Amino acid sequence: MSQVRGGRIYCCNLGDSRCVLAREEGGKLKAVGLSDDQKPERADERARIIKCGGRVAPLEDENGEAIGPQRVWLATMMMPGLAMTRSFGDHVAESVGVIPEPEIMDYPLTSNDRFMVLASDGVWEFLDNQAVVDLVASCSGNGPEACKKVIKASYDAWTREEDVVDDITCIVVYFP
């Protein structure tokens, strides 16, 4: 969740959705991350999970080979298998340190800031921040068109790389 107020952007993040700002620098748009994903790969997040008695490891196939990202597990059970370290309402994961507490960040809005993109992990799994900013920039201020373009690129990447497609949500906010 983000709010623009009084010349500042307030970004409140929980989990692996992300907020990215497009800032013009030297005539080009640069992606600036306004939120940090809370995933088990982050040292501070991993430390909290382990301190609370959880385990961090990827899912494994029948041969013991790692599949996918690091996940949060109970110490002795293969559950919940959450690929993020903060979320609402997951009481099993909460018992091993997954918390519903967001990180709140505050940034000054400048005259060089053009737009921000808020999107679910279904977008960020295969597209990096700059790729998404470039896709949105190619839509000349047309928000619905920009969202469709990001969603299509994300969907296409998922179908190339995986047998399933994650949820894909995208919001674009332009600054005057």
Predicted regions and their residues:
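PP2C/PPM-type serine/threonine phosphatase catalytic core
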Residues: M1-P176
